[in-house]
Design a protein with these regions (language model features):
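Long, acidic, intrinsically disordered low-complexity segments
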Residues: 2-66, 149, 168, 172
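Elongated scaffolding segments in large macromolecular assemblies
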Residues: 3, 152-196
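Conserved aromatic-histidine-acidic binding/catalytic patches
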Residues: 26, 48, 63, 86-90, ...
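N-terminal interaction modules that seed assembly of large macromolecular complexes
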Residues: 40-101
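Amphipathic alpha-helical interaction surfaces
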Residues: 66, 70, 100-111, 127-130, ...
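Short coil/turn segments at secondary-structure boundaries
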Residues: 72-76, 110-115, 165, 182-185
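Aromatic- and glycine-enriched beta-alpha-beta binding-site module
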Residues: 83-130
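Compact, glycine/acidic-enriched structural inserts
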Residues: 119-148
Length: 196
């Protein structure tokens, strides 16, 4: 069985598990689209203690750092619907955001995808700032591991390098059990690919 056949087969079985009426349009052609898809797919298909959700998270963790589309078993999450024409920027943004979320969620009991914290959007920047403040102690901000890793993210010359450096910060966020909005991260990753 080819990768495409496996992905199509999984998408068919998923459509029986999840009613398509409540699924947002899987178009990934804009930052708004990728944000909406990630914000929908995490709570509706990937969260919880059900075996299907736990297996999906494990498969997504396996996809961290891998090429978009390299793992057919995660297509239904990272691509939305198999066989649809996709925007490459959208695919990369969703794949990266969801695989990093699965790594961040890890064995944490509390949800690591949070749209808001006390009424304020929980962006990547807000989560990193909270993490830096939490672990700062007597150090100056630029002396903290978070600052060094954030500097690597900011200086990333290519998308693959950006994703690699984001992984380091996600590991710190996981250890500190600090959630963030992965929909916003997906939108940021989409926009990063088209600098103005």
């Amino acid at each position: 069985m080819t990768g495409e056949e496996a992905g199509a087969r999984q998408a068919d079985s998923a459509s029986k598990l999840y009613p398509e009426a409540d699924v947002p349009s899987p178009s990934l052609g804009s930052a708004k689209d990728v944000k909406r898809w990630v914000r929908w797919v995490i709570p509706h298909r990937l969260s919880g203690r059900e075996p299907v959700a736990m297996a999906a998270r494990a498969q997504l963790r396996h996809g961290v750092g891998k090429e978009v589309g390299a793992i057919p078993s995660i297509w239904m999450y990272t691509l939305g619907a198999v066989g649809t024409a996709w925007n490459c920027k959208g695919e990369k943004a969703v794949h990266t955001a969801l695989t990093l979320w699965a790594r961040h969620q890890g064995s944490n009991a509390a949800p690591m995808h949070m749209v808001e914290a006390k009424g304020t959007p929980r962006s990547f920047g807000a989560a990193v700032r909270a993490l830096a403040e939490k672990g700062r102690g007597d150090k100056r901000p630029e002396e903290t591991p978070v600052f060094r890793r954030l500097s690597s993210v900011v200086a990333a010359p290519a998308f693959d390098a950006l994703a690699h450096h984001l992984r380091g910060i996600v590991d710190l966020l996981e250890a500190a059990e600090m959630p963030m909005d992965y929909g916003l991260l997906a939108a940021d990753l989409f926009e990063w690919q088209s600098p103005q």
